[in-house]
């Protein structure tokens, strides 16, 4: 369809290819000397420790440029107070590549409640504070101080999701595009391999960076828009039509049909060009200055942006910032399977740089034996920015490429035990799924392929995933393949054979899934399926677990305080948790990360998923105050005695006193108990071994003995006694998730909404949407989607 796109492995290599492949990309002058380099062509500045592994951005981008023949150096986590650290490798011949790392630096540094974190999984020994706030901006400014005439190419997830004027949760205001604040020359959004290779080769050929205004997947700062583009104005919401002027019924007509003598001549047929030709049309967003003080207009701008994300039919965007024009080119064309295999088939040492010695890097330990099999997500969850970053079209690796990486892990990773920790990506089961109609895919503007029901054109056959799992199990030296990425259970129930394969061979006792909520209001704002879909998956999960003779459990994840969630919704969710014997040790409030639809809801308090109007906009309830956010979080931990006073006060205020007491249908007891807190009951403090656990109670025989609890669960039910609780299960990471093995440092920003972990079966509480299949027109039961982790 786009034959004019040059494959990333078909460019003529730069002359420096004669130096060959480096064991590690150099991080010092001494290493450059050992390689025989007098200078670097490209220097990558990153906020993460340098790990030469394809799940880390600096490695995959560095190795890709190296494969093009360029000499690439790495400056990892430099001291940012002065320019000195940015000059350690000398002046790059072509450009500085600046990235904050695999995670947004603000999400990495602050919790959803804006409290400072004291750890950093991407830093040796988990040490916090090794990168500045707004990392991309600071690094760019220091690079400019070091060498004023060297082009700065901005990339990574932090820059990608801030490419236009955006709401900034941490300062609670709308900020300019990061391209203007950082004073960089060009911004690459998405995974960006295609754009980066083109920029590098054009610079190597002597072209000025200022001339590169037409590269897909880039944003540039211009004085005026290109002349050959037609601009569609979307800066206003309620555009008034021309006023209706009634005609005078008594007016005498001087010309009429009976008086006409002239005969009309035949006119030539002309074909009017489409006004929506993506190649010659751009959409003007409201200016930054207007968005600062107009929340409704901000929601409108967010909606327009999300409608223009299709790489084939989406148009360029232009936004005024003062006297400058921010020009955002069309989204990049997805990589083909051949290109994906090329990127992941490059040489990687698969270990941290030797300069770190024996220091532990938690993010690396988490993904060192996992394999990324695909990119992208068509789920469209409103709180997730994976689609905005990686795209809606799934980019797949071949089975052969994946199997080769499994063998490489077996042979190269120190201490490999034979267990593959994950085969996945943004989600576990979208491998080789997609639209069955290429023409429809090229023109589709739906924000989700699975909400409110699965599109009838979506191929949901999991055959390729099943074949991949079986081939992975047959690799010599591989004892176990675990699926740790979140499963899209709404897709999984379309293929029961996949559920059987997954449950029988690839679940390590617990399986993560993400219903996110139980109530219709929040679920509709999240663009997630109803609990009927969850119940159907749970039935299949339990059925196939029993057939395999295994005791296995679902670990659902929930988000508190998401836009669209009211206090009563959280009470109903808490009742659902209690009725299903779930106790959540660690939960997560909604985190408004840049560019998400849910972030626009949070800021504007209206629904950007539908047409936005000034007159009677669809209001969305938002928990913004600290007290309400604390309450929503506390309700997910209804079993914690420390939360009972707050919950008790809220229930009384809501007129739900009947939920207070010792009866089975009550949520919390009438009086506080002297029983220990959940942290004390598991014999650990805030940083204990079970800190991230979610517990399923009463349903795991014999587990009390494993916990050293011989009393067998004495005490008042649901009063805070944890003696009956089950095993700890893994928690979701914050921000873009390294654990799910996302590609190349652009670990999507699933942000850290999803640390909350709970629930298992639907109850009668609340008004939850039901259904577990395709729309009725497909001949199946109703079904609504979910967004997997």
From Swiss-Prot:
Needed cofactors: [4Fe-4S] cluster
Entries under SMART domains matching the protein: Elp3
Domain Radical SAM core: 363-642
Keyword annotations: 4Fe-4S, Iron, Iron-sulfur, Metal-binding, S-adenosyl-L-methionine
GO molecular function: 4 iron, 4 sulfur cluster binding; catalytic activity; iron ion binding
Cofactor note: Binds 1 [4Fe-4S] cluster. The cluster is coordinated with 3 cysteines and an exchangeable S-adenosyl-L-methionine.
Record's keyword annotation contains Iron-sulfur: yes
Residue spans of biased composition, Polar residues class: 716-726, 733-763, 778-789
Compositionally biased intervals (Basic residues): 683-698
Protein family membership: Belongs to the UPF0313 family.
HAMAP family (UniProt xref): UPF0313 (MF_01251)
Protein name as it appears in the record: UPF0313 protein VC_1711
